[in-house]
Amino acid sequence: MANQRMLGFVHTAQRMPDKRPAAERRQDFAEIYARFSDERANEQANRCSQCGVPFCQVHCPVSNNIPDWLKLTSEGRLEEAYEVSQATNNFPEICGRICPQDRLCEGNCVIEQSTHGAVTIGSVEKYINDTAWDQGWVKPRTPSRELGLSVGVIGAGPAGLAAAEELRAKGYEVHVYDRYDRMGGLLVYGIPGFKLEKSVVERRVKLLADAGVIYHPNFEVGRDASLPELRRKHVAVLVATGVYKARDIKAPGSGLGNIVAALDYLTTSNKVSLGDTVEAYENGSLNAAGKHVVVLGGGDTAMDCVRTAIRQGATSVKCLYRRDRKNMPGSQREVAHAEEEGVEFIWQAAPEGFTGDTVVTGVRAVRIHLGVADATGRQTPQVIEGSEFTVQADLVIKALGFEPEDLPNAFDEPELKVTRWGTLLVDHRTKMTNMDGVFAAGDIVRGASLVVWAIRDGRDAAEGIHAYAKAKAEAPVAVAAE
């Protein structure tokens, strides 16, 4: 009875992979979860009830065929499970590690709603695809024929790389341009190693190179070439730069030293982990060692910052967030990990200013009451009069979200249209901007979001580019000449 299909959840409890003790994982940047054993993966995959309406798949941005690869895993058919997994996702082993499954597939699992505990979808996904790499099943997707057309991709993050792989598989010569010296974007420089070890990204980047994708690192559009120049070189150009401009806080003392942006802090930490020498880390300005650290914000980036500060040897780490725990945008799992590792959360508190002469010594804050819900359904923060207090701080990290850069100006293309939020305006069916042959995908279109949404957008953009290139090739010569 225990092995009966679709009833495994009745007899088998939810079990996550083994997690390293908090005291141990505070000491390094290695991933905190072990991989499932074969037996554990089979057991946990067998908990899937094979629902008639798979809400896990419905709530997956790339529409992964989750019940199918869970069933195949439970039957020991791992190579088939891998084939199903990679059919809808360019980076499944990455999503298995960093997706907030508690907000997506697992949070909407029918078994979770029935109080039996969700199927551990993300951990099984990681197991399937890590096994595929170990067994040599992962191969470059080379085209059956070359089309003789080239596409330029600006940005080597998840949206850009997903599109690059799809386009290369269709037969395009794909050139990826990125401002950094390594490909991967925020997968390399924004997400800490304890969530995503960089070797996992590096092997994917190499796989695309083996398929024929051509990389141009240290290439900045607007400096090394303008967007008009790239348009003349390629049949189509995809803008997938992400959003890197940090939201700031305007408060007394915000210009003091040692008040830094989250991405600057995380990028420095990741570069050091990769073996680079970074002056800002060496001189202590972007190094939490021995400091009282306060992180402002409640999203996943804030969680990355507090957990990084712990590993760098901070004396204390506090997270200041204006709403309560249940209303924070970050993953609840990440909050739990942070608490285990020694982070203190100060809920319903907002910064009002900073103390110090030349460098910050404290954060002046006020207590917050959550009032009536706004149009989005979230309760509106309201300041409690007379509730001021100060938190000691030698380093303040602002993790308040990201905004788009001024791309029309940066790319020397003033005709490129943006929305009122500064994101690129696209036709959401084709992903094309207002400029012929210029497409956009990922955060630069939807705003700061999840890696898995960037993958979906990149895949969709590749289809839009392919349809555009085909139509252009089939058009009458006179029209094409115009």
Swiss-Prot record:
Outline the extent of the 4Fe-4S ferredoxin-type domain. 39-72
Q: Which domain of life is it from?
A: Bacteria
Q: Which reaction does it catalyse?
A: 2 L-glutamate + NADP(+) = L-glutamine + 2-oxoglutarate + NADPH + H(+)
Instruction: Name the pathway it acts in.
Output: Amino-acid biosynthesis; L-glutamate biosynthesis via GLT pathway; L-glutamate from 2-oxoglutarate and L-glutamine (NADP(+) route): step 1/1; Energy metabolism; nitrogen metabolism
This protein's cofactor list reads:
[4Fe-4S] cluster
The answer to whether keyword Iron-sulfur applies is yes
InterPro entries the record matches: DPD_II, FAD/NAD-bd_sf, FAD/NAD-binding_dom, GltD-like, Helical_ferredxn
Q: Which GO BP terms sit in this record? A: L-glutamate biosynthetic process
Tell me yes or no: is Kinase among this UniProt entry's keywords: no
> Top EC class per UniProt?
oxidoreductase
State its Enzyme Commission number(s): 1.4.1.13
* Record-listed [4Fe-4S] cluster binding positions: C95, C99, C105, C109
The miscellaneous annotation reads: Glutamine binds to the large subunit and transfers the amido group to 2-oxo-glutamate that apparently binds to the small subunit.
Q: What is this protein called?
A: Glutamate synthase [NADPH] small chain
| Organism of origin | Azospirillum brasilense
The gene for this chain is gltD
